[in-house]
A protein has these predicted regions:
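Amidase signature
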Residues: 1-121, 266-474, 484-518, 531-535, ...
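Short, well-ordered beta-strand elements within core beta-sheets of diverse protein domains
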Residues: 69-76, 130, 148-152, 249-255, ...
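Conserved hydrophobic/aromatic pocket- or pore-lining residues that grip, position, or stack substrates
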Residues: 88, 126, 132, 164, ...
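ATP-grasp fold ATP-binding core
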Residues: 119-138, 171-174, 191, 446-447
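Enzymes and membrane/adaptor proteins characterized by extended Gly/Ser/Thr/Asp/Glu-rich
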Residues: 123-163
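Short glycine-rich, flexible loops that bind phosphorylated cofactors or substrates
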Residues: 139, 179-180, 306, 454
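Peri-catalytic substrate-binding/gating loops that frame the active-site cleft of hydrolases
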Residues: 145-155, 243-244, 298, 310
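Short glycine/serine-rich loop segments
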Residues: 157-267, 475-483, 523
């Protein structure tokens, strides 16, 4: 009797705690949404007052200027920081209503604007800049779309925000991202799903998807994202803008390559080097970026692990032809052992603990639909994962290997063994890849970029396609994307016959994910060797220029 009563009481306590935790999470989410609504409302009121007192401000002209043109006019005083700021703030508010891309307006930006004219300095003087939600801004949450991170405001600005402010920029809005940043979709239980600026039935991509949508929709001229597996490049591709992952993981997103280069020039300054000694104290090499020397370019249509969609492959062929016509040399290139690298380094490396750390982070609140399929997979008992993996091996080459990789290691000694083995293999792989580049005698690589934009709820089911982006995070190579085309009716027709390399579930899902994309942007990816960021950007600029010339 006593034992039964004790068990019943224990079960009741667990239930009460669970209900209480869910209620607390719900209340936290509601408070966060209220803060966002209030910040948007206050910004709308200030913009309205400015509009009433400055009816002659030509916002259409301001929004049409490139970053280089805008900074020139700000420096010359032919435009004021106020005119630029309020034009972009108003546009951001309108874009957000359509795409749900912002997590909070940084109301401190109004105060910064008041003092900016007294200190007219910096390469980005008077430029309003958007920043991804996970970038620290004093007194604001870095939620990462996770409930447990709510109401824990940053104690100070991140280094990148400090440098941007020093260069005269005005961070004015934080943008949306997927829950826990472990998806290339853009939805979380706090702020919801961000939509694609070209088609609201498609995702903006992620994890810097709020940035992609806001810039693609015209609400920001320059944004800062982060990229640990393609998180700048994928939303840039999906939203039809340019994005750059430097040798380091945090980088700019904008509508053109010159804007990316100007931002990198602004960031690689003495202030950055003094605040963050881990950044090599090497200023941006403008001469290297502006070089017109013909390049020797390696190119690939497929990495042999994930079959590119028809529009991805076509874009590579078209850009290759343009580059050859412009006098560059194109040679076939194939990355080394992508299949093994994806399994051993990417999946097994990220999920060495069997995804326990990530699941713990999610326990404080609801799981977003864009992450639910992944979480379902991770929470399958390890013994069952291994059985399923064994049974599926004859029928599906990739999924069983991924399932086995995300099962994690069996013990702490095994973790150390894996860590030691990966360290050696990782160093060897980088050396081998660089040696492979040298043998091919290439300066840069042109490769496919994931796209076009996916239909909702597919990103979390297709992990294989990130081979095109995550490989360069692993190698620590600078990589960027440039929009070069749009999906054609012929691409859609060819997609009907798409089988993929392995003809497995992942290939079938990829086909479904990109169906119905006619007219959506398609990009290519440009890659260079470590710390040759200027070379990568110069290559991107060349691609951009040739594509624009062709359109004329």
């Amino acid at each position: 009797m006593l034992t039964t009563a004790a068990c019943g009481l224990g079960a009741l306590l667990v239930l009460v705690r669970s209900v209480s935790a869910r209620r607390a999470a719900k209340e936290k989410i509601q408070r966060a949404r209220t803060r966002r609504t209030e910040s948007l409302h206050r910004a709308e009121q200030v913009v309205l007052r400015y509009r009433q007192s400055h009816p002659s401000t030509d916002s259409a002209l301001i929004l049409s200027l490139s970053l280089s043109e805008l900074t020139k006019r700000l420096q010359e005083d032919s435009l004021s920081p106020e005119e630029v700021f309020y034009s972009y703030m108003e546009k951001t508010l309108n874009v957000h209503k359509e795409l749900n891309c912002c997590t909070e307006i940084l109301l401190e930006s109004f105060e910064q604007l008041k003092t900016i004219s007294s200190k007219k300095e910096g390469l980005l003087y008077g430029v309003p800049i958007s920043i991804k939600d996970n970038i620290a801004y004093k007194d604001h949450d870095c939620t990462c779309g996770v409930v447990v991170n709510l109401e824990q405001p940053a104690q100070g600005d991140s280094v990148i925000v400090k440098v941007l402010k020093k260069q005269g920029a005005i961070p004015f809005v934080k943008t949306n991202l997927p829950q826990a940043l472990l998806s290339y979709d853009c939805s979380n239980p706090i702020y919801g799903q961000t939509l694609n600026p070209h088609n609201p039935q498609k995702t903006s991509g992620g994890s810097s998807g709020g940035e992609g949508a806001l810039i693609g929709g015209g609400g920001s001229i320059l944004g800062i994202g982060s990229d640990i597996g393609g998180s700048i490049r994928i939303p840039a591709s999906f939203c039809g803008i340019c994005g750059f992952k430097p040798t380091a993981a945090t980088g700019p997103m904008a509508k053109d390559v010159d804007s990316l280069a100007l931002c990198m020039q602004a960031l690689l300054c003495d202030h950055m080097f003094s605040l963050d000694p881990t950044v090599p104290p090497v200023p941006f090499n403008v001469q290297l970026y502006q070089s017109s020397k013909p390049l020797r370019i390696g190119y690939l249509e497929s990495d042999g692990y994930s079959q590119p969609t028809p529009s991805m492959a076509r874009s590579i062929r078209e850009v290759k032809a343009l580059l050859e016509q412009a006098g560059h040399t194109l040679v076939p290139y194939q990355p080394l052992r992508v299949n093994k690298i994806m399994t051993e380094f990417i999946f097994r490396g990220i999920f060495a603990d069997g995804a326990i750390s990530m699941i713990q982070k999610l326990k404080g609140g609801p799981v977003d639909p864009c992450l639910q399929n992944q979480v379902n997979l991770y929470t399958i008992p390890t013994w069952l994962k291994r059985i399923i993996s064994f049974l599926l091996k004859p029928f599906s080459p990739r999924f069983p290997v991924i399932l086995d990789a995300v099962s994690g290691v069996k013990s702490i000694p095994d973790l150390w063994k894996q860590h030691a083995a990966v360290e050696v293999l990782y160093a060897d792989y980088i050396s081998e890849t660089i040696a492979h580049w040298r043998r091919c005698n290439i300066d840069v690589v042109l490769c496919p970029m994931i796209g076009p934009a996916f239909n909702f709820n597919y990103c979390g089911q297709i992990s294989t396609v990130i081979s095109y982006t995550a490989l360069y995070n692993l190698l620590n190579f600078p990589a960027g994307v440039v929009p070069v085309s749009t999906v054609t009716a012929d691409d859609e027709e060819e997609l009907k016959h798409f089988k993929g390399i392995f003809q497995d579930r992942m290939d079938k899902l990829l086909k479904k994910a990109v169906t119905g994309a006619e007219g959506l942007p398609v990009a290519v990816q440009c890659v260079a060797l470590p710390w040759q960021d200027e070379v990568c950007l110069r290559f991107m600029k060349e691609v951009e220029h040739l594509v624009k010339q062709k359109r004329k």
